[in-house]
């Protein structure tokens, strides 16, 4: 159907279906409602995976709670049916846009294998109860076909949870439990088929005291299966062919399961180490370097303490590398939500454009300083400014002991040194010693990054320079005369640059004109040489050459006037 046809159909729809659509909205496959529905479907699927097999292999369990099983069976069937309805109301992405047209959703769903599996899982095989009796739960094995829905729920949870590694381990343990559970059920069913107590391998005769209880039957079977699959204990030797086949199958399953478990655990551990390496610096390399270079123990202890502080307090120093795979705009939004409030406290950045602050936020570099470490010293060249995120810094004298002031969270320093303010008496050098009292977390903004951003915002640059001038005036650090001299020098330099630009433009124009004249002269000479060659060899000259030559040199043709002009110009030239 065309787009126009869709519009007409929507407009002609009566109010009743519109109201129905409100009650049955289209779900976003990445939304919360769809996620929680997937988690709801975990329960009926796990019920069928665990209980149905157990009921089929342990007759006492099936007979003792028949009514409860019927209630749970048809409750799970109802959820299966509702799940198909949810699938008919779950949108999908097409060219990045969520499709909410229910006709398109239904058409797409019924053409997938998922729809066929969902239908097969709801085939009413229970109708055979009428002929075979209600104690054959194996008729419900087709409910296992809904297992892909379980895997989808696990994948979504692993993506959303804050502890993905713990969830992976829990999921692996669940798989191990299901495998051992199924194996124990098959072991008990095989023992019943071969005869209880016929040899040491099968389940003991229920006539013995204690072995007739259902709980003992299941726990014994589960224990026996655990011994076989984990190969950690002695088990009775098989005696019959069926027992040998069962043991061989279990041993093969144990080998494959052991490889799977080891691979999964290795993957989890590797992911944990990779995450730590991405968030925190690798201290092992630094420790090895210090050992090879014979760094003194005191300095080595400080370095180790710094790494330990980062690890214990979850401090990150490489946010750029962590967020590098995000799209630029999304990375900017994350950085803005984390750091914009801190940057807004800086006086020279107040009332600046929001887009400017967003770009500056991406340039902030987190740094952590140890107790007693100098952030900057008096006289150092200032190439960056600092914003205190957490901790305390002291303005100290040259002796490093006398404190003039203490700077806390939210304060900043060094902002004047990264802005080129004319007349700044201190230039771009530090005017104080700043030392960290404890562990301090700072944000660093370099002069190069600020200059790069301000190149796109000249108006904001002028506003910042004006604010910097006001700050310097209050501090009596602004030389007005020097500022005027620098401004005059800058204006003179700009005037000279404009003059040079104008001269350069004139030279380029003259060069282009001369180049055009040179090309024209070369073309005329080429035509003349070719014409002389034809005349020298007394060949009949082509008409097009004569016409082209006449057009190129109207004063030097074959006419008498042309010959006279040529002779006047220099008769010996042709000779």
From Swiss-Prot:
Biased segments, Acidic residues type: 544-554
Region (C-linker): 274-350
The record's account of how the chain is modified after translation: N-glycosylated.
SMART domains, per the entry: cNMP (SM00100)
Native organism: Rattus norvegicus
Region span, Disordered: 537-575
Protein name: Cyclic nucleotide-gated channel alpha-4
Residues that, per the record, bind 3',5'-cyclic AMP: 430-431
Residues that coordinate or bind a nucleoside 3',5'-cyclic phosphate: 348-471
Coiled-coil intervals, chain numbering: 493-547
Chain ranges passing through the membrane: 39-60, 71-91, 117-135, 141-159, 167-190, 214-248, 249-273
Membrane topology summary: Multi-pass membrane protein
Domain topic, free-text comment: The C-terminal coiled-coil domain mediates trimerization of CNGA subunits.
Gene name of the record: Cnga4
Tissue spec. comment: Olfactory neurons. Expressed in olfactory sensory cilia (at protein level).
Oligomeric form and interacting partners: The olfactory cyclic nucleotide-gated channel is an heterotetramer composed of CNGA2, CNGA4 and CNGB1b subunits with 2:1:1 stoichiometry. May form homomeric channels gated by nitric oxide.
InterPro entries xrefs: CLZ_dom (IPR032406), CNG_cation_channel (IPR050866), cNMP-bd_CS (IPR018488), cNMP-bd_dom (IPR000595), cNMP-bd_dom_sf (IPR018490), Ion_trans_dom (IPR005821), RmlC-like_jellyroll (IPR014710)
Keywords recorded for this protein, A-Z: cAMP, cAMP-binding, Cell membrane, Cell projection, Coiled coil, Ion channel, Ion transport, Ligand-gated ion channel, Membrane, Nucleotide-binding, Olfaction, Sensory transduction, Transmembrane, Transmembrane helix, Transport
Gene3D superfamilies given in the database record: 1.10.287.70, 1.20.5.300, Helix hairpin bin, Jelly Rolls
């Amino acid at each position: 159907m065309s787009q126009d046809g869709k519009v007409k159909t929507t407009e002609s729809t009566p109010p009743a279906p519109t109201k129905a659509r409100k009650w049955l909205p289209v779900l976003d496959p990445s939304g919360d409602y769809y996620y929680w529905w997937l988690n709801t479907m975990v329960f009926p699927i796990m019920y069928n995976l665990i209980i149905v097999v157990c009921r089929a292999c342990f007759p006492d369990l099936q007979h003792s709670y028949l009514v409860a099983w019927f209630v749970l069976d048809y409750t799970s069937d109802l959820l299966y049916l509702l799940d198909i309805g949810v699938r008919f109301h779950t949108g999908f992405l097409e060219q990045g846009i969520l499709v909410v047209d229910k006709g398109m959703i239904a058409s797409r769903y019924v053409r997938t294998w998922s729809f066929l599996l969902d239908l097969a899982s709801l085939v009413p095989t229970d109708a055979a109860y009428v002929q075979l009796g209600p104690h054959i739960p194996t008729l419900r094995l087709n409910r296992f076909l809904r297992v892909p829905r379980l895997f989808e729920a696990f994948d979504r949870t692993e993506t959303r949870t804050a502890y993905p590694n713990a969830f992976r381990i829990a999921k692996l343990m669940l798989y191990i439990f299901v495998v051992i559970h199924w194996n124990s059920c098959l072991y008990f069913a095989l023992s019943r088929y071969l005869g209880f107590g016929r040899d040491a391998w099968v389940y003991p005769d229920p006539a013995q005291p204690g072995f007739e209880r259902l709980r003992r039957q299941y726990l014994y079977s589960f224990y026996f299966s655990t011994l076989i699959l984990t190969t950690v204990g002695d088990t009775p030797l098989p005696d019959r062919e069926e027992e040998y086949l069962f043991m061989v199958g279990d041993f093969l399953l144990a080998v494959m399961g052991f490889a799977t478990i080891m691979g999964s655990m290795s993957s989890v551990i590797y992911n944990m180490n990779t995450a730590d390496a991405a968030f925190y610096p690798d201290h092992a390399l630094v420790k090895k370097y210090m050992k090879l270079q014979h760094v003194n123990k005191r300095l080595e202890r400080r370095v180790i303490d710094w790494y330990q502080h980062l690890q214990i307090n979850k401090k990150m120093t490489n946010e750029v590398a962590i967020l590098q795979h995000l799209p630029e705009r999304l990375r900017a939004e994350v950085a803005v939500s984390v750091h914009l409030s801190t940057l807004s406290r800086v006086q020279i950045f107040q009332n600046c454009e929001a887009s400017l602050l967003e770009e500056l936020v991406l340039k902030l570099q987190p740094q952590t300083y140890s107790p007693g470490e100098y952030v900057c010293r008096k006289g150092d060249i200032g190439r960056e400014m600092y914003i205190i995120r957490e901790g305390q810094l002291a303005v100290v004298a040259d002796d490093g002991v006398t404190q003039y002031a203490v700077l806390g969270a939210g304060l900043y320093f060094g902002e004047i040194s990264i802005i080129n303010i004319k007349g700044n008496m201190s230039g771009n050098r530090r005017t104080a010693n700043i030392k960290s009292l404890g562990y301090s977390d700072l944000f660093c903004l370099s002069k190069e990054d600020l200059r790069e951003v301000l190149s796109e915002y000249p108006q904001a640059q002028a506003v910042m320079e004006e604010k910097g001038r006001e700050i310097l005036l209050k501090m009596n650090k602004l030389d007005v005369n020097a500022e005027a001299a620098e401004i005059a020098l800058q204006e003179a330099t700009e005037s000279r640059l404009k003059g040079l630009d104008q001269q350069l433009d004139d030279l380029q124009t003259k060069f282009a004109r001369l180049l055009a004249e040179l090309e024209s002269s070369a073309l005329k000479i080429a035509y003349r040489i070719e014409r002389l060659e034809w005349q020298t060899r007394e060949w009949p000259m082509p008409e097009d050459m004569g016409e082209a030559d006449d057009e190129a040199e109207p004063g030097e043709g074959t006419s008498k006037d042309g010959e006279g002009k040529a002779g006047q110009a220099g008769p010996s030239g042709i000779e």
